[in-house]
């Protein structure tokens, strides 16, 4: 089979959709997780973070609880036109009529397990993002805080800034790898292999040349049953993240894993189940890379996933 003529140029990961039977139950979690409601229709609720994206998360009323796909912004409208003509099961370009920020979109199904993807262009960004305070710290040999000042915090959800990444379990790792990395400007930041030396997990970033980007905006691993693993949202700093952890704990939500520090990507992580069993992550302090950084390889063992934190749950990669 011949490959595509060229790669579709993705600019950033934009937003994600989840479908729920009980929209108000999904909304309750969204507010406790730190999203801000932007608008709603009869069957959708849109949420933003405190960044400039018009929305980063959307829940949709549906007969079943299921993943609704992730959207990436493309470089220009020509990329949308090319995508609509070359990607499998792709739609024509259509208007995002009820979505905050508007814009145009192409939706397609990837050929391995049929996950939905959305490519968008022309969304109007918010005029400005809300600035949160950058704290100063008193280290043993360097005291940054002014004299007679205090660190005081408010108990509240951890406000979301942006969608950082998402991930799948795919049933054919190599086929998925070949499709994504030949059709889009993804570059593997880290690849892991199993005990037989077979590749089984990849963390991929967008190749934007010299521009610094997150260590990964997309990851996937090999498994017997295809499913979305989690969507991850950046919050402000570690105190904010820890306050959000306590907020969710006191609200009775189930923690999957965290708080801890990843090795690949370096993020401080905190994974939670919503009421319908989908996994959402708060993260802070992730690595930034550009095209000059080469792919790293490692064995897929539990100790490569984190350097500190609670023990790795048995069901984390199920």
PLM ranges: what are they?
Residues 16-18, 29, 38, 48, ...:
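A structural feature that tracks compact, well-ordered secondary-structure segments
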Residues 1-24, 69-70, 131-174, 187, ...:
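N-terminal beta-strand motif that seeds the catalytic metal site of vicinal oxygen chelate
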Residues 1-107, 121:
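An N-terminus-focused feature that recognizes amino-terminal "leader" regions
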Residues 173-260, 267, 274-276:
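Structured core of small recognition/catalytic domains
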Residues 2-6, 12-21, 61-86, 88-159, 162-171, 202-205, 252-318, ...:
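Vicinal oxygen chelate
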Residues 8-54, 111, 168-213:
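Core segments of cupin and vicinal oxygen chelate
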Residues 43-44, 66, 100-104, 196-198, ...:
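Short acidic/glycine-enriched loop/turn segments that link adjacent beta-strands
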């Amino acid at each position: 089979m011949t490959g595509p003529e060229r790669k579709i140029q993705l600019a950033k990961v934009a937003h994600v959709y989840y479908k729920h039977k009980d929209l108000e139950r999904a909304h309750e979690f969204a507010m406790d997780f730190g999203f801000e409601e932007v608008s709603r229709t009869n069957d959708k609720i849109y949420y933003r973070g405190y960044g400039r994206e018009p929305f980063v998360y959307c829940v949709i009323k549906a007969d079943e609880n299921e993943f609704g796909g992730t959207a990436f912004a493309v470089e220009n409208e020509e990329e949308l036109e090319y995508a609509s003509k070359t990607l499998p099961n792709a739609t024509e370009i259509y208007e995002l009529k009820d979505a905050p920020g508007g814009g145009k979109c192409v939706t397609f199904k990837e050929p391995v397990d049929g996950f939905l993807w959305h490519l968008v262009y022309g969304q109007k960004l918010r005029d400005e993002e809300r600035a949160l305070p950058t704290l100063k710290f008193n280290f043993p040999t360097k005291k940054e805080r002014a004299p007679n000042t205090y660190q005081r915090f408010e108990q509240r959800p951890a406000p979301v800034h942006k969608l950082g990444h998402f991930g799948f379990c795919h049933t054919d790792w190599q086929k998925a790898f070949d499709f994504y990395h030949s059709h889009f400007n993804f570059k593997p930041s880290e690849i892991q292999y199993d005990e037989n030396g077979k590749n089984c997990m990849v963390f991929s970033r967008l190749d934007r040349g010299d521009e610094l980007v997150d260590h990964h905006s997309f990851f996937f691993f090999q498994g017997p049953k295809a499913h979305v693993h989690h969507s991850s949202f950046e919050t402000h700093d570690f105190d904010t993240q820890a306050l959000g952890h306590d907020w969710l704990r006191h609200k009775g939500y189930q923690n999957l894993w965290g708080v801890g520090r990843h090795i690949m990507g370096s993020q401080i992580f905190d994974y939670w189940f919503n009421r319908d069993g989908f996994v959402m992550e708060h993260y802070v302090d992730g690595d930034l890379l550009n095209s000059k950084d080469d792919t790293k390889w490692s064995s897929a063992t539990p100790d490569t996933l984190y350097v500190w934190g609670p023990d790795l749950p048995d069901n984390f990669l199920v």
